[in-house]
Amino acid sequence: MNSFNEGAVSPLLSIWRHSLWLSGVLLLSACGSHSELPPFTASGYVGDQGAVRIWRKDSSDDVHLLSVFSPWRKGDTTTSEYRWQGDSLSLIELNTYSQPPEHVRIRFDDRGELSFMQREVDGQKQQLSSDQIALYRYRADQIRQTSDALRQGRVILRQGRWHANNTVTTCEGETLKPDLESWAINHIERRQSHSSVEVSVAWLEAPEGSQLLLVANEDFCHWQPTAKTF
């Protein structure tokens, strides 16, 4: 899932940091948004080491969240799945697509007490320390808070296949023309010129504007969650 290269990371990060794009979203969410939010949402943000995409489904008091981290250069793609019942975290499941791959699964009971834990690396099962579990819980809290802010701030993730006329066929089958800056379009076109297939793009839309998130040869739509399957 590595996407940005050839120096494309720096302009993206500088633009986001200069405009305080995510900070603006956090401030907007802090002010509160009382209009009804859809139960299934997709969002994301730019991190220091890579892009994060978040899918979330809210049903009654339950929250199901999937976070996908894609590194800019070095590092491994990681998926993190979480479930909450009310405010209580009930599941953490992590997959790191490294060599060898790593899988972590942690469950908590209705009282928030640990009920199951396991780490598996290259087929070898291991136990987790209390410090490791505490770190995973902390990360779960952080991604939940970030997701809350992005959701309230109306930051929407869109993905699809890029076409030569600067339009995208999204994973939902819509044809859109993202309102991206010229440097972002130039970057996509450079990537496309080195690919024999139409590249996939992911971008974010919000009241503050649109930002390119990822470009890759991989078909993002092949594995993207949907409201029915998530």
PLM-predicted stretches and their roles:
Residues N2-W21:
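Bacterial N-terminal signal peptides that target proteins for export
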Residues L27-A30:
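C-terminal motif of bacterial Sec signal peptides marking the signal peptidase cleavage site
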Residues G32-H34:
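Bacterial signal peptide processing site
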Residues A206-F230:
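OB-fold/S1-family single-stranded nucleic acid-binding modules
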Residues E36-I92, T96-R154:
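Extended, compositionally biased repeat/scaffold regions that form elongated interaction surfaces
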Residues E174-R191:
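Beta-strand/loop nucleic-acid-binding surfaces
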Residues R191-Q211:
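Flexible glycine-rich surface loops and low-complexity tracts that mediate binding to linear polymers
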Residues D148-T169:
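Structural detector for short beta-strands of small beta-barrel domains
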